[in-house]
Regions:
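Active-site acidic/histidine proton-transfer and metal-coordination neighborhood
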Residues: 7-9, 20-21, 87, 106-199, ...
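Hydrophobic faces of well-ordered beta-strands that scaffold small-molecule active sites
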Residues: 28-37, 66-68, 92-97, 129-131, ...
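Conserved, mostly hydrophobic/aromatic
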Residues: 32, 58, 66, 85, ...
Length: 320
């Protein structure tokens, strides 16, 4: 039996993966995110698809692994989580973890949350702990951080790094709309005052005013994980201006299948590969199902399939 690829964490052996067309240098490195199927914990987000259908569609597309997704979508205990994923031939990468680290009074609580999640990820074979720096756990509108705030955050991130290392994980910082690392100014402060690895999210960087291609070229050495997300900039601008909430923007189609938005996905991947990046690329097109569940074999699976087709036809031919 082939051994899992060390550069991707817990990839499945290649001969166990369904082949749906070559991805060249990206074979075995493209993974799924439940949000691409509309799975989100935000009240009023939309219809939630059953986990068995989502996992089955991931497997049908030949995706070898997934992030955890919203609370309640997958079991949050072992061995239940690994057993469920195993039925669909999927490995666990890790997942998205909101933490409050700018307030020293909440540090102990944040570290306790981080430890609990790290234990779950480790037990399930995960390798990536994706930190989002929220204002609070209700996702209140963030207060733009100062340099002093970010120095405090940096101290907290180092403590989370230690927790992750003790559980065989790599922490990556996720710039994200609605967090304290949202805008180009926030990203610059975080780069200057923290030494954490990064999750390069092409969509959220673009929305925040950061060119993801330039980020990949300049900071590729700090990238430990990647979310591939395309964006309709016109809709994103309405979110940034406050005309639309993030949820309204998603429901209006702000995030698009790869190759149908305004992000230079191919240039970003090429820059990352040239920087030496060897990790996962997670397909993450946030959607909201607002008109009920789609018929079997239709709906989100079509968009994810289109993302894979984009990688095969547009990105892979540009890679060595």
């Amino acid at each position: 039996m082939a051994t899992p690829r060390a550069d991707c964490g817990s990839c499945l052996p290649e001969e166990e993966l369904p082949m749906s067309g070559t991805l060249g240098a990206l074979d075995g490195r493209i993974a799924a995110a439940p949000i691409s199927w509309g799975i989100c914990e935000v009240p009023g987000w939309g219809e939630m698809m059953p986990s068995e259908r989502v996992l089955g569609e991931m497997r049908e597309l030949g995706l070898p692994a997934t992030e955890l997704g919203a609370p309640g979508f997958l079991p949050e205990a072992e061995p239940e989580l690994s057993e469920l994923l195993g039925r669909y031939g999927l490995a666990m990468i890790g997942g998205f973890v909101p933490l409050v680290l700018h307030d020293p009074a909440q540090r102990a609580d944040a570290l306790a949350r981080a430890t609990a999640v790290a234990k779950l990820f480790q037990a399930a074979g995960g390798t990536r702990f994706v930190t989002a720096l929220v204002q609070d756990y209700d996702w209140s509108t963030p207060v733009p951080p100062t340099a002093d705030d970010m120095k405090i955050v940096g101290e907290g991130l180092r403590e989370v790094d230690a927790i992750c290392a003790a559980h065989g994980l790599v922490q990556v910082l996720h710039p994200h709309v609605g967090t304290i690392v949202e805008t180009a100014a926030d990203v610059a402060l975080a780069l200057e005052h923290t030494d954490v690895a990064w999750c390069l999210d092409t969509g959220h960087l673009q929305i925040g005013g950061v060119d993801p291609v330039a980020f990949a070229k300049e900071y590729g050495h700090r990238v430990g994980h990647v979310h591939l997300k395309d964006v309709d900039v016109a809709t994103a601008d309405r979110v940034v201006s406050g005309e639309l909430t993030l949820l309204q923007g998603v429901q209006a189609g702000m995030f698009r299948a790869l190759g149908t938005g305004d992000v230079a996905i191919d240039d970003a991947v090429v820059a990352l590969e040239e920087s030496g990046y060897q990790g996962w690329y997670v397909l993450e097109q946030d959607i909201a199902l607002t008109t009920g569940l789609p018929a079997e074999g239709t709906g989100p699976i079509d968009d994810v399939r289109a993302c894979l087709d984009c990688l095969r036809t547009t990105v892979v031919p540009r890679l060595p």
